[in-house]
Amino acid sequence: MIKLDWNEYLEKAAEVNAEGAVLLVNNGVLPLDKNAVTQVFGRIQLDYYKSGTGSGGMVNVAKVTGITDGLIEAGAKLNEDVLKAYKDYVAEHPYDYGEGWGGEPWCQEEMPLDDSLVKRAAESSDTAICIIGRTAGEEQDNSCKAGSYLLTDGEKAILRKVRDNFSKMVILLNVGNIIDMGFIDEFSPDAVMYVWQGGMTGGTGTARVLLGEVSPCGKLPDTIAYDITDYPSDKNFHNRDVDIYAEDIFVGYRYFDTFAKDRVRFPFGYGLSYTQFEISAEGRKTDDGVVITAKVKNIGSAAGKEVVQVYLEAPNCKLGKAARVLCGFEKTKVLAPNEEQTLTIEVTERDIASYDDSGITGNAFAWVEEAGEYTFYAGSDVRSAKECFAFTLDSTKVIEQLEQALAPVTPFKRMVRTAEGLSYEDTPLSKVDEAARRLGYLPAETAYTGDKGIALSDVAHGKNTLDEFIAQLDDNDLNCLVRGEGMCSPKVTPGTAAAFGGVAKHLEELGIPAGCCSDGPSGMRLDVGTKAFSLPNGTLIAATFNKSLITELFTYLGLEMRANKVDCLLGPGMNIHRHPLNGRNFEYFSEDPFLTGTMAAAELEGLHSVGVEGTIKHFCANNQETNRHFIDSVASERALREIYLKGFEIAVRKSKARSVMTTYGKVNGLWTAGSFDLNTMILRKQWGFDGFTMTDWWANINDRGCAPDKNNFAAMVRAQNDVYMVCADGESGSDNVIAALADGRLTRAELQRSARNILSFMMSTHAMARKLGEDEAVEVINKPAETVDDGEGDRVFLLDGDLTIDMSGVKTERNLDYSFTVDVAQFGQYRMEMTASSTQSELAQMPVTVFSMGTAWGTFTWNGTGGKPVTFAVEEMPMFSRYTIFRLHFGLGGLDMDKIVFKKIRPAEAQVCRLRISERWLQTQTYFWLKANFQSKKLLRGRRAYR
């Protein structure tokens, strides 16, 4: 029996929270005096954003420690009058969940500050903290508007009153990624710190930094410019149909430190400490790279950690280069004053090389080191790094010769650095015949033998080969094997994203287990309401620059996955922070691909150490949420290789990633779910990947030049994208696999190839070990007792037309959840009615929030009804997922539930039924449908009626 100590898990996450906090301004106000009274302003002190929105943040937790909670638990003295005022305000203005999936507001309504309250508070101390909160996420990019990237008038009013009344003002940013920092010029705060979104322990780690228990040691994973228009991608970001990556390799600091140094407010890698460090470094050339040795000494008066960052300046020859490129980093231990530590940073030739996508160096489609001087810089950020080593290469060296792959087909001009400065040039276009390339790599078919009585366990135990097992599978078996089943498949852990592998009866009879996927990367999403651990977001993790610490944290997550029988976490997210307004930046790490790949590799090493897997996503160039199902990301092969694929390559080569998810959209004209160049040529042939790949949930697939089709599994399998996520039932579907086998568009050998990828992976999972009775259980200890919904996995109701569910006797205690599953026989639009009564006073308020598949559809508040039944309704609720999980969250007790009624308003359109489109697609379409048809919240408020 393996034990997972919940207290150790909490402590490790709090360590990450503290190390990821990035202090940008400090005029001597931090750390706070623990014995002095501190005022905290901003409602987010009571509504802490633990993560962004969408699948990457939907982790159900028993407790979230916000910033105020963390300060109080650490023994800080807060102004009770100010805290009470905010508690009263939040009680009257509860958290706004918005209009369902993709419709959450970016921020919460702020409390207007009463002048007398502020003046009284200022009499008790001279220090005030102001907390600004932001969220965004799946289907919802940020916007350069007040309440998102910019501050609201209400927030500015708070900052103005605090600035006018307090001599020391601290601003904390509880955000998923960077926001506009113009408030520094307007309000001159004495301290500013990004504390990001820290998961369920965010306030604990933040308090440790504020109170000086931990010296801040986080570093910016992104460049903060003066204006949003300073970012070179801004001209094309948010285009709905085609996004031209005209800035090419010049993303983030690569652009600013090459062309626009004066437009940087805070440079990449920057972050202050409560102490000071002295860094001295030197380097030496090796056969396969460079080794930098850096000595770090704490020359200040407080203990702390420092990050040594190594940057390369490559010769700007035929291939235009960025002025600086991060190629290595290490973090010290905690150094006491006058203590020093020596760090060794190894830089490989692959980290030094550039990709020639045109042949301008004489080496087309190769990683090369051009002749010239290579200079290395070491320091605490990209700007302060000092030269520490240089070497000269006499002639151009080919590091790796490849074949052209994934190059653009659409002509465009790309940014380039010449001897004269910034210029633009024609981008090299694809010369590849994709159809011919695929035929050139067709695998050999294994002859069909029929059932020989070989079970997958026989392969696992070495009695038979995998090819002998696969030879038994007929076309239908192979077809079922490339289907994932979900969401919330009953074959795996309740409330998870998908089952894969043994999703059909005959596959199960052959001994193939059903593997389980759960949404990530901020922890496990369990839509039945099961509580899990919510981790710090990706941006915060990157800001730690601490590889070993992140590996330790994800080892705990891996054990939690095992305890919940989850085999694959759908994360880490690895897309690049190409633009600050991308809604899912909170899930991703950085604008830099080396930092991205290195931190993802650290996460994977933690998961792998306990035998579970992380699915690296979204492969690749998923850099905006606007129209993400159809957007065409048009980028040069060089930009893809050096920026947008680089992090994935590091994760595959360094940590042997074995699970990959493609995107919803297109890259250079082809939906990634069916891209042979991406899934076979680059991932497998060039990088050596030996795992399995999956689509994103209900993704489009196409053949070059053809319309997208969610049923085109043939194109998916030809590309060697192995599993379609997801189908309502693994036994059947409306895909085109059998038809494509019949007419020759798909070969049986290609289906067998995907089967081999899937089954090879399955045999390495704990799902297989469980099926063989060989798995070691994980026991979670020291997890606080919580009110649980004991029957959550057993309540399944068939919805075939209308349905009435008896709710009498259901407990409605404060913060209790009640979950049930509806097996939807007929997809369509339904009215959901909830009837309840209460003998509480007429002024009593008993809120109930309705969640469907983890998404809040609305909050309905009953007052005392004198014992009479009162009905609220969601007037129209689209239901397109066969197993739809509902969760009711009771804010307070005192409510007597009567019944829930589902009434079908109209069936789904025939095309929708044929495609068996399910929850995540539905949520996307529902959001836009709501926006188009209802400008108010009338639909979600429902209707109240006495009977």
Swiss-Prot record:
InterPro entries from the UniProt entry: Cellulose_deg_GH3, Fn3-like, Glyco_hydro_3_AS, Glyco_hydro_3_C, Glyco_hydro_3_C_sf, Glyco_hydro_3_N, Glyco_hydro_3_N_sf, Glycoside_hydrolase_SF
EC number: 3.2.1.21
GO MF annotation list: beta-glucosidase activity
Catalyzed reactions: Hydrolysis of terminal, non-reducing beta-D-glucosyl residues with release of beta-D-glucose
Residues forming the catalytic site: 696
Highest taxon above the source species: Bacteria
PANTHER family: BETA-GLUCOSIDASE
Protein name: Beta-glucosidase
Originating organism: Ruminococcus albus
